[in-house]
């Protein structure tokens, strides 16, 4: 009798994806982030579901319903903070995952990579809409500022913004639709993640050396299931340290003030994981130019496969490209810092220089270093 694991139509899919999957024998801890993102998504869907049971998407009661969750619902505070900090963990894993892809040349799997970019946009949209739901000051003004950016689109801009708002300003209709979208998008993300995996399993995983690993494969279970569980334990440890010791560390104190359309906060800024893109947006004095730069800050990832000039796939043996990669990481940290600063003299210039450097690394310096390294190989 055949093993049910290999014969049952449904169990067979799980078996081929997580148990008998042939995996390269040398993939490092940087390959853990895919499974960690899956865990983050599950945590977010579960905690979000329980929050949605008590939340009301009405401008008059939204803020108090979140307060009610924290004060009166059994373990409501831990569910709420796991959801808020879970989003931060999600983005940390996402940035690490994308960074790994750039460093080791995983972007040469173009279908997987492009679905990944689509996933990133969807996750960012979901997080933005989730930030609006508590209806604090930063929720309201963040929603106003970010949705207003669409008015920069020529001809249809103003109509588009009012259509998204459901009126002439961010109000009850906006909050209700944002809640609806925030609820449905994680399930769309789950479907996209399944497609992401489907495309990945067509080619098999990349590995740190960037060479074909067909001659040396090991089964996913038990080797990488155990390895992923270690990563999972560390993720949960960090998440629970955040939730139980400093739940508001990554949040904005302004969001504990109920939304007031008549009072603008001194510094309107998004959550920390959007600050790098926000800094790029602000560094361009033109509204439409800023919006384009904002979109391109993520969309530039789609151009990387076309600009891969090196004969080697991975950066493992390419010191020049490695230096550029870590310069990019430092640049992103600088942009994140600038995004949280007021629009004043030194910060404006630093932001503009960091933005120029960001695009230069992707579009000019990395392809150039690939060509130079090819020449050095012949030398």
Swiss-Prot record:
InterPro entries: Cyt_b/b6_C (IPR005798), Cyt_b/b6_C_sf (IPR036150), Cyt_b/b6_N (IPR005797), Cytb/b6-like_sf (IPR027387), Cytochrome_b (IPR030689), Cytochrome_b_C_euk/bac (IPR048260), Cytochrome_b_N_euk/bac (IPR048259), Di-haem_cyt_TM (IPR016174). Keywords: Electron transport, Heme, Iron, Membrane, Metal-binding, Mitochondrion, Mitochondrion inner membrane, Respiratory chain, Transmembrane, Transmembrane helix, Transport, Ubiquinone. Signal peptide: none annotated. Heme b b566 binds at residues 97, 196. Heme 1 (or BL or b562) is low-potential and absorbs at about 562 nm, and heme 2 (or BH or b566) is high-potential and absorbs at about 566 nm. Component of the ubiquinol-cytochrome c reductase complex (complex III or cytochrome b-c1 complex) that is part of the mitochondrial respiratory chain. The b-c1 complex mediates electron transfer from ubiquinol to cytochrome c. Contributes to the generation of a proton gradient across the mitochondrial membrane that is then used for ATP synthesis. This is Cytochrome b.
């Amino acid at each position: 009798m055949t093993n049910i694991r290999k014969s049952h139509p449904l169990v067979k899919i799980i078996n081929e994806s997580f148990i008998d999957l042939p995996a390269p024998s040398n993939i490092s801890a940087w390959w853990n982030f895919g499974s960690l993102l899956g865990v983050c998504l599950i945590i977010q869907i579960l905690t979000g579901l329980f929050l949605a049971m008590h939340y009301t998407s009405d401008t008059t009661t939204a803020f108090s319903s979140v307060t009610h969750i924290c004060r009166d619902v059994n373990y409501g505070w831990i569910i709420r903070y796991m959801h808020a900090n879970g989003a931060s963990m999600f983005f940390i894993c996402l940035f690490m995952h994308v960074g790994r892809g750039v460093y080791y040349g995983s972007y040469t799997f173009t279908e997987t990579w492009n679905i990944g970019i689509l996933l990133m946009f969807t996750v960012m949209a979901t997080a933005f809409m989730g930030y609006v739901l508590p209806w604090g000051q930063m929720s309201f003004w963040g929603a106003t500022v970010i949705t207003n950016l669409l008015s920069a689109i020529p001809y249809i801009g103003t109509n588009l913004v009012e259509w998204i708002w459901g009126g002439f300003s961010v109000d009850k209709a906006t909050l209700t639709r944002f809640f609806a979208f925030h609820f449905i998008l994680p399930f769309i993300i789950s479907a996209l993640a399944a497609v992401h995996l489907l495309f990945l399993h067509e080619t098999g995983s990349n590995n740190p050396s960037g060479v074909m690993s067909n001659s040396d494969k090991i089964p996913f279970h038990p080797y990488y299931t155990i390895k992923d569980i270690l990563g999972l334990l560390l993720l949960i440890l960090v998440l629970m340290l955040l939730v139980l010791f400093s739940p508001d560390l990554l949040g904005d104190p302004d969001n504990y003030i109920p939304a007031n359309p008549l009072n603008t906060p001194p510094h309107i800024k998004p959550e920390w994981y959007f600050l790098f893109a926000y800094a790029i947006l602000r560094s361009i004095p033109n509204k439409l130019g800023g919006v384009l730069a904002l979109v391109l800050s993520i969309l530039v990832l789609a151009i990387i496969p076309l600009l891969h000039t090196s004969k080697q796939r991975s950066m493992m043996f390419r010191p020049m490209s490695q230096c550029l990669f870590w310069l990019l990481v430092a640049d992103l940290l600088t942009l994140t810092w600038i995004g949280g600063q007021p629009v004043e003299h030194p910060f404006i210039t630093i932001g503009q220089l960091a933005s120029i450097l960001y695009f230069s690394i992707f579009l000019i310096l990395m392809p150039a270093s690939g060509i130079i390294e090819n020449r050095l190989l012949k030398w």
